[in-house]
């Protein structure tokens, strides 16, 4: 049995304790482990009103298994947590195995999400922090969503939404914010999917988020080009000349409070953020936010800088949703070595965004 670190201090509780639902994600992955590790942190456990949406037996078995290991970080005791016990039928439950995803684990993780979304839309939670799911397991269970973000958008009835990745540097305190213009689509479809209308929609969402969630009413946004060297005057691709540069000129006229830089060659756009992450953010003058045009263009640099602490934030929803920026990690499930830093960051950021939206003191 592992005890909480008695040297930890607890801040005075906030005037308002954000009500957050924590979904455990795929029961075959590390979701239960990182949640129990995160909730053992007194800062998190005492400052926020947290409810875990999961099969209770999964949390108890995870706690029992991991507690028998030596040199393990503290774990929250499930018997002391607020848990909403969401179960699947016995036959499905018997098919769930630690370390792998299948139709059964997909059905379970979908049930956790479905419940949390319904209760949040009903006003019983202020936001959701989602554990990692396996898209292949969802598909095997008959749920054909590209990811959790798309399910959240559909259930919320919104058509405008985006994936914003947020990370605070432990070295300088600077905050990285990177929005993806396109998300879970094949690379060969990116150029045809990108349009001026789509980028205007994403830029609208980004500006609204900066103003509403981060209190940034003026600043600088960097926009990546699509092609190497941003096309190099049409020699390496013509999208920049054909429509991306004219689109940016039009957007600059409509948004005088924000400096829109771009299209910046994708490889060099991330130099200043990298320097600001590890060095002096004031000297480097990084942008307040970055708009990447496709998934890996944004997430490779984000994960290089902040793999253990980046947070996926769904913007455009009627409530706050965050998620740790890592997957199910089936290969290390049950070994006690999963890093809970990103889950802690996801919980803390969700609480901050809830308070910001409610105009309450943190």
Swiss-Prot record:
Pathway: Cofactor biosynthesis; pyridoxine 5'-phosphate biosynthesis; pyridoxine 5'-phosphate from D-erythrose 4-phosphate: step 4/5. Disulfide bonds: none annotated. SUPFAM superfamilies: Isocitrate/Isopropylmalate dehydrogenase-like. Keywords: Cytoplasm, Metal-binding, NAD, NADP, Oxidoreductase, Pyridoxine biosynthesis. Pfam families: PdxA. Its cofactor is a divalent metal cation. GO terms for cellular component: cytoplasm. The keyword Metal-binding applies. One of its GO terms (biological process) is pyridoxal phosphate biosynthetic process. Its main location: cytoplasm. InterPro entries: PdxA, PdxA_fam. HAMAP family: PdxA (MF_00536). NCBIfam families: pdxA, PRK02746.1. This is 4-hydroxythreonine-4-phosphate dehydrogenase. It comes from Nostoc sp. (strain PCC 7120 / SAG 25.82 / UTEX 2576). The gene is pdxA.
């Amino acid at each position: 049995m592992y005890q909480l670190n008695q040297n930890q201090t607890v801040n005075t509780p906030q005037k308002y304790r954000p009500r957050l639902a924590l979904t455990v994600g795929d029961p075959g992955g590390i979701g239960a482990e990182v949640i129990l590790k995160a909730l053992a942190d007194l800062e998190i456990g005492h400052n926020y009103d947290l409810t875990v949406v999961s099969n209770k037996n999964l949390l108890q078995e995870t706690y029992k298994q991991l507690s028998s290991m030596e040199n393990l970080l503290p774990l929250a005791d499930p018997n002391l947590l607020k848990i909403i016990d969401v179960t699947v039928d016995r036959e499905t439950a018997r098919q769930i195995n630690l370390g792998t995803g299948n139709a059964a684990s997909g059905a379970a993780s979908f049930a956790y999400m479905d419940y949390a979304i319904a209760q949040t839309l009903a006003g019983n939670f202020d936001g959701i922090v989602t554990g990692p799911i396996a898209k292949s397991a969802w598909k095997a269970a008959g749920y054909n969503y590209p990811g959790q973000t798309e399910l959240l958008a559909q259930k919320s009835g919104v058509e405008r939404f985006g994936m914003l990745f947020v990370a605070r540097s432990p070295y300088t305190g600077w905050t990285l914010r990177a929005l993806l213009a396109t998300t879970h689509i094949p690379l060969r479809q990116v150029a045809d999917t990108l349009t001026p209308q789509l980028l205007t929609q994403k830029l609208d969402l980004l500006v609204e988020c900066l103003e509403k969630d981060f209190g940034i009413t003026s600043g600088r946004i960097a926009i990546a080009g699509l092609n190497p060297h941003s096309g190099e005057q049409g020699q390496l691709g013509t999208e920049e000349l054909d429509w991306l540069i004219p689109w940016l000129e039009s957007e600059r006229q409509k948004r005088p409070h924000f400096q829109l830089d771009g299209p910046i060659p994708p490889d060099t756009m991330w130099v200043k953020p990298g320097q600001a992450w590890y060095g002096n953010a004031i000297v480097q003058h990084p942008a307040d936010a970055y708009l990447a045009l496709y998934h890996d263009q944004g997430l490779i640099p984000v994960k290089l800088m902040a793999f253990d602490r980046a947070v996926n934030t769904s913007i455009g929803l009627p409530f706050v949703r965050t998620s740790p920026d890592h997957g199910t990690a089936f290969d290390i499930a049950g070994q006690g070595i999963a890093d809970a830093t990103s889950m802690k960051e996801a919980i803390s950021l969700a609480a901050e965004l809830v308070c910001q939206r409610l105009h309450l003191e943190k």
